[in-house]
Amino acid sequence: EALSEEQKREVLIEVLPWLRGKVSQEKRLIGTVQSGERILDFVNSVDAERLSELGTSCPDHFLRTKIKPLFVEWNPQAKADSFADAIEDLKVLLADGLEQYVADYGEYYERCKRPTSPALRQSVPTVVLIPGIGMIAWGKSKSESRVTAEFYNCAIEVMRGAETVNRYRALPEQEAFDIEYWLMEEAKLMRMPPEQALARQVVVVIGAGNGIGKELCHRIC
């Protein structure tokens, strides 16, 4: 079941900064949280883990979403004596899940790489699915993480549509890899302009209701 808005807020306040640190050990990432009805219907469904493990099918999405998300099987009512304990349980599940995801992604790269393949990219998940909470998408900027979230929303709709008529099938692993690590895509990444000084940073400006603080916010956004 979906948590109340107050409970979701409590979880995210406690978990989100910690999780950002975990996924940002190689390069800092910025998160976008989505917990709308469609996302919650998916992550709370009995088929969510099976479908998410199969991966996405749209070639244009692989650079953002990777071949698959990290799905965390968390039930705050299952074992914990209190909600605070449930949040700590979630942290343990996330830490274990991230470690396994990174290992699996490295094996996927080694299994599928070709002599001309670009080097292994950042191997943490860019989409994290948590029952009761929704989706946390990651990117190098807020706008990129929002795009990642929208791409995975599209993937969910494809899965939902496929499951209504038959069974969802993702692209074969090698084909997915060849798209994700396509040399033309790598060339586009290499041609991107250099990141600005505060890229990937989260900035808090105190006293920004008016005057200098407000003007500073407009200048750095």
Label every model-predicted segment.
Residues I220:
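Aromatic pocket-lining residues of Rossmann-like dinucleotide-binding sites
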Residues E1-A199:
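Domain-length cofactor-binding catalytic modules of enzymes
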Residues G209-N210:
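Conserved glycine-rich cofactor-binding loop
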Residues G213-K214:
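N-terminal Rossmann-fold NAD(P) dinucleotide-binding loop
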